Amino acid sequence: MAFLKKSLFLVLFLGLVSLSICEKEKRQNEEDEDENEAANHEEGSEEKRGLFDIVKKIAGHIAGSIGKKR
């Protein structure tokens, strides 16, 4: 009977340890995904700002050339 108790405790302990390791890896993966998502959002914002600057420069050149023609 004592042998069965020890075996059962060992199985439960190993199960809890493996479950704990899986949960830790899952949390790390979620944190990595959140960081990647934040980085992608920042890159998108920078691209939009860069595009806006280009459009603004082109509009300025067009307005300047129209003003010179008058």
Swiss-Prot record:
Matching Pfam families: Antimicrobial20 (PF08256), FSAP_sig_propep (PF03032)
The record's keywords, sorted A to Z, are: Amidation, Amphibian defense peptide, Antibiotic, Antimicrobial, Cleavage on pair of basic residues, Immunity, Innate immunity, Membrane, Secreted, Signal, Target cell membrane, Target membrane
Lineage: superkingdom: Eukaryota
User: Where found, per UniProt?
Assistant: Secreted; Target cell membrane
Q: Name one GO cellular component term.
A: other organism cell membrane
Q: Which residues form a coiled coil?
A: none
The record's similarity note reads: Belongs to the frog skin active peptide (FSAP) family. Aurein subfamily.
- Protein role: Amphipathic alpha-helical antimicrobial peptide with weak to potent activity against Gram-positive bacteria, and no activity against Gram-negative bacteria. Probably acts by disturbing membrane functions with its amphipathic structure. Shows anticancer activity.
Name of this chain's protein: Aurein-3.1
Question: Lineage, please?
Answer: Eukaryota, Metazoa, Chordata, Craniata, Vertebrata
